[in-house]
A protein has these predicted regions:
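N-terminal low-complexity, intrinsically disordered segments
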Residues: 2-4
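Short loop/turn motifs that connect adjacent beta-strands in outer-membrane beta-barrel proteins
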Residues: 6-20, 56, 104-108, 135-146, ...
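Outer-membrane pore/translocation modules
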Residues: 13-132
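Outer membrane beta-barrel transmembrane domains
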Residues: 120-176
Length: 176
């Protein structure tokens, strides 16, 4: 989730807005094949994005920390991870700086950017790239459909294309 901390309107002249945000999330992964649905892994991320907007153009610069941790139930079922001192083989920890540039003239948005990872454990190639398009037709209504396609490429995987297609309903400006 992203929360705005402070916004400057017309900071560099009329229509130039700058905002500092904080973002955080936790993603739990459960073993649904077990009767107790044990927590296998939990991923955390904490970031400090700065967003600049002028008319239809926006830019997000962000420092982000990401980490993944094994769940207690998983380690209890696999004690060899702890006894063989292999815990660091399963931990993922990195920081990144990313920049994403966006153009949103009306009911569609196109974006693209890059990320550079640093302080990475385990060590890996540092560069990533993202781009995509989002469509929100009929966005003048409080409830409307949205769809998009997101592409993610990583140097670590020889720039193989990873893509995600999204469809949903957006609710905004609800009249109460």
């Amino acid at each position: 989730e992203v929360f705005g901390l402070y916004r400057w309107k017309d900071v560099f002249g009329p229509g130039h807005h700058l905002q500092i945000n904080i973002e955080g999330a936790a993603f739990g992964y459960f073993d649904l094949d077990q009767s107790q649905t044990d927590l296998q892994n939990i991923d955390f991320q904490l970031g400090l994005p700065v967003v600049y907007r002028y008319e239809d153009f926006s830019t997000r610069l962000r420092l982000l920390h990401r980490s993944a941790h094994l769940g207690d139930e998983y380690m209890a079922r696999h004690p060899e991870i702890v006894t063989q001192n292999r815990l660091t083989d399963y931990q993922v920890d990195n920081n990144l700086f990313d920049a994403v540039f966006s153009y949103k003239p009306d009911w569609w948005r196109i974006y693209g950017g890059f990320a550079y990872l640093f302080d990475v454990m385990p060590e890996r190639d540092p560069w990533e790239m993202v781009y995509g398009i989002e469509l929100a037709p009929w966005d003048q209504y409080a409830i409307h459909p949205v769809l998009g396609v997101h592409f993610h490429l990583q140097e670590e995987f020889d720039w193989d294309l990873n893509h995600r297609y999204v469809f949903g309903v957006e609710i905004h400006d609800w009249p109460f």
